[in-house]
């Protein structure tokens, strides 16, 4: 699997020469101490840059950030007052994501010692407001985080934003391979691929299934045997598992990954209606590739496949999978949704050691496919779907509470997860349907609604979040406003 490179984030402190060189030296020293502490807690490299105290220095720094491929984004903070007209030229040219950090070096006011020297130096309270006005006046998208720089909650929010920017950078260079077309007559999996490349950076290429079959057939027996040994070390095998069927999935896994690596594709889709030349619908093979970090979705759903790859980058490839709303449990007061798919759920969400099972599957009209069977973990999670509204893309997300499933399903040998949608089954599903949310989603225990909203903001697309505070009336109003805004 292609590993995403590590990025840097630049920390730029704003000031001005009005207070003299001694004050600027103290600003630089405070900034250095802050960055050294933050570097210990943040998930990406934080690089301190010289204090920005003139229009020329600011423009130079922003141009350098634009031209540095290792720089994923910048973090700005105004230690003293920094007149915002100094920032106009730099902000006009900046093309990297920006986080405006409203903090100050001292946590507490030194009540007995505070004087005008202290006041002149520690002016974040109005310096950051001045800077914030200019960014808003110029209509520049950015993230704002407020709080003391040593606060664990604040550091986590900055770290979460860094991860989101990584996902943004991945999106801008993402290539998706489609094996076959969409499931016939299905609407929500369709979409404008040209607009997706313009807006999201996603390059989508279609391939006949024969191109893939040729690569699968070139896989050697030795390669299959080596992968089977890996399967035995990671999973249990059902006592009735047809070993030849499992070996076929190993061959498919190697073949698909080889095809993807040759074209630098990091996401892909298949469809059970385009399997000519294949013995099985890819099941275990797809689950394994998702576990390695590839994005995937079934039935030709390239949007969800790409979204899964992007969100796996955001989540560090932990606890994140392709998902489908499968069937409802409507017991009064215990309404829940069973999420699954025919075969393809990622084992990173498993609560137990997955089991390899070979069982019949009517879809695709091929030999019985091998798949990993397991139950998902309990815990707070979310579902996210990306849909094409014709004039724009919309990201729809719903926070859920995944629960331990006490029931076995011996006649349904699939991986699954059971959840309660928030705030309730009726409110969540009604709001989801009003928003046009798809039946295919990305399910994740690791990603927050704030990160999803931040990613959508970076991409310039609409985002609807349904959480424990939502109600249908509120969501319908938001949809109404967004139709006019977009």
From Swiss-Prot:
Record key words, sorted: Arabinose catabolism, Carbohydrate metabolism, Isomerase, Manganese, Metal-binding
Reaction(s) catalysed by this chain's protein: beta-L-arabinopyranose = L-ribulose
Known cofactor(s): Mn(2+)
Gene3D superfamilies in the cross-refs: 3.40.50.10940
Any GO BP annotation: L-arabinose catabolic process to xylulose 5-phosphate
Molecular-function annotations in GO: L-arabinose isomerase activity; manganese ion binding
Cofactor note: Binds 1 Mn(2+) ion per subunit.
Superkingdom to which the source organism belongs: Bacteria
A GO CC term attached to the entry: cytosol
Family according to the record: Belongs to the arabinose isomerase family.
Purpose: Catalyzes the conversion of L-arabinose to L-ribulose.
Protein's recorded name: L-arabinose isomerase
Lineage of origin: Bacteria, Bacillati, Bacillota, Bacilli, Bacillales
């Amino acid at each position: 699997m292609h590993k995403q490179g590590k990025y840097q984030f630049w920390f730029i402190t704003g000031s001005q020469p009005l207070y003299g060189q001694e004050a600027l030296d103290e600003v630089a020293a405070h900034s250095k101490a802050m960055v050294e502490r933050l570097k210990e807690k943040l998930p990406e490299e934080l690089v301190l840059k010289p204090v920005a105290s003139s229009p020329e220095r600011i423009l130079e720094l922003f141009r350098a950030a634009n031209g540095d491929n290792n720089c994923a984004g910048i973090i700005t903070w105004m230690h003293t007052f920094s007149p915002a007209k100094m920032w106009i030229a730099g902000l006009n040219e900046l093309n990297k994501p920006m986080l405006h950090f409203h903090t100050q070096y001292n946590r507490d006011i030194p009540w007995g010692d505070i004087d005008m020297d202290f006041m002149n130096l520690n002016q974040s309270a109005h310096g950051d407001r001045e800077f914030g006005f200019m960014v808003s006046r110029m209509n520049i998208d950015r993230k704002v985080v407020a709080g003391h720089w040593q606060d664990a909650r604040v550091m986590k929010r900055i770290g979460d934003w860094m991860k989101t920017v990584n996902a943004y950078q991945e999106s801008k260079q993402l290539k998706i391979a489609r094996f076959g077309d969409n499931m016939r007559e299905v609407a929500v999996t369709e979409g404008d691929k040209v607009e997706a490349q313009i807006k999201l950076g996603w390059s989508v290429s279609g391939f006949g299934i024969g191109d893939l079959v040729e690569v699968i057939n070139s896989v050697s027996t030795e390669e299959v045997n080596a992968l089977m040994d890996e399967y035995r070390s990671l999973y249990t095998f059902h006592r009735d598992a047809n070993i030849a069927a499992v070996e076929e999935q190993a061959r498919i896994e190697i073949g698909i990954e080889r095809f993807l690596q040759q074209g630098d594709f990091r996401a892909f889709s298949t469809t059970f209606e385009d399997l000519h030349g294949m013995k099985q619908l890819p099941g275990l093979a797809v689950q394994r590739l998702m576990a390695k970090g590839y994005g995937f979705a079934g039935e030709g759903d390239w949007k969800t496949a790409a979204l899964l790859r992007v969100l796996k980058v955001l989540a560090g490839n932990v606890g994140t999978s392709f998902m489908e709303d499968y069937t409802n449990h409507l017991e009064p007061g215990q309404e829940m949704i069973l999420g699954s798919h025919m075969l393809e759920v990622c084992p990173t969400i498993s609560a137990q050691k997955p089991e390899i099972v070979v069982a019949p599957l009517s879809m695709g009209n091929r030999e019985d496919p091998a798949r990993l069977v397991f139950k998902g973990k309990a815990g707070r999670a979310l579902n996210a779907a990306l849909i094409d509204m014709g004039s724009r893309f919309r990201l729809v997300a719903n926070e859920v509470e995944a629960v331990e499933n006490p029931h076995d399903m011996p006649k349904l040998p699939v991986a699954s997860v059971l959840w309660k949608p928030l705030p309730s089954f009726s409110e969540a599903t009604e709001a989801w349907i009003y928003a046009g949310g798809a039946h295919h989603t990305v399910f994740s225990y690791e990603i927050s609604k704030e990160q999803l909203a931040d990613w959508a903001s970076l991409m310039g697309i609409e985002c609807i979040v349904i959480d424990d505070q939502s109600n249908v009336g509120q969501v319908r109003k938001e949809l109404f406003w967004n139709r006019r805004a977009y």
